[in-house]
């Protein structure tokens, strides 16, 4: 059957990962809760805000890498808190120094503090510089299919359109734009931001996303560790449903059992 989907490995920057759930490290009560939640999530890629997290640049303070060791997790430094391309590029270069030449980064350049919406003009500028500088750039962007295409053409290895605004938990607000991005993209598409609960993650995966990145949905849950485990299963279920192919929607009913041979 030509329309049967077969699974393929989730690969970024030449590395293959088993988990399609990426998680952030902010907003937890303490480092122990961070550790427990990330363990429960099964995530292999953990994103860290370089400007807000001690990765060794502040000796004598708690170091996140002590509870999330780089030999167990792939650390994905991000540029959260940057509002222009210059800041973002500087932050990525700092991360590379702190992580011994690590080139995989998550680029985000924000427009304002109220919406945390991406500034796509500055994002594109930063992406072009970082790619030339040898970085493997995963990029947070709007759900504009044209911008997503331009970022991929600039050399980003993955585009990460928002489902909803960061920290809102609103779920996928514009599935139609996301579907266009998924159909057109030649690089992996990961939903980033806006996920609120397990069903949101499942829907993103059912649509065909390669993976989902989240932080607030787990950290702000009443029981973060339990929600982390729920998200692990949600991602797997969504991927399996995508591969299986859902039944077509119909307006009218269709009996599950055959009508011939009924007992009279």
Swiss-Prot record:
Please list the reactions this protein catalyses: [ThiS sulfur-carrier protein]-C-terminal-Gly-aminoethanethioate + 2-iminoacetate + 1-deoxy-D-xylulose 5-phosphate = [ThiS sulfur-carrier protein]-C-terminal Gly-Gly + 2-[(2R,5Z)-2-carboxy-4-methylthiazol-5(2H)-ylidene]ethyl phosphate + 2 H2O + H(+)
Tell me, in one coarse class, where this protein mainly resides: cytoplasm
So where does 1-deoxy-D-xylulose 5-phosphate get bound? 167, 193-194, 215-216
Q: Listed GO cellular component terms?
A: cytoplasm
Q: Where do the coiled-coil regions begin and end?
A: none
Tell me which UniProt keywords the record has, alphabetically.
Answer: Cytoplasm, Schiff base, Thiamine biosynthesis, Transferase
Q: Does the keyword Transferase apply?
A: yes
Q: What Pfam families does this protein's entry cite?
A: ThiG
Task: Give the enzyme's main class according to its UniProt record, as a single word.
Answer: transferase
Which GO terms fall under biological process for this protein?
thiamine diphosphate biosynthetic process
Identify the domain of life.
Bacteria
Quote the catalytic residue positions.
106
List its EC numbers: 2.8.1.10
Annotated GO molecular function terms are: thiazole synthase activity
Q: Where in the cell is it found?
A: Cytoplasm
Q: Which InterPro entries match?
A: Aldolase_TIM (IPR013785), Thiazole_synthase_ThiG (IPR033983), ThiG (IPR008867)
For this UniProt entry, which segments traverse the membrane? none
Which pathway does this polypeptide act in?
Cofactor biosynthesis; thiamine diphosphate biosynthesis
The UniProt entry, under HAMAP family, shows: ThiG (MF_00443)
* Record-stated family: Belongs to the ThiG family.
On assembly, the entry states: Homotetramer. Forms heterodimers with either ThiH or ThiS.
**Role, per record:** Catalyzes the rearrangement of 1-deoxy-D-xylulose 5-phosphate (DXP) to produce the thiazole phosphate moiety of thiamine. Sulfur is provided by the thiocarboxylate moiety of the carrier protein ThiS. In vitro, sulfur can be provided by H(2)S.
According to UniProt, the name of this protein is Thiazole synthase
Supply the source organism for this entry: Pseudomonas putida (strain W619)
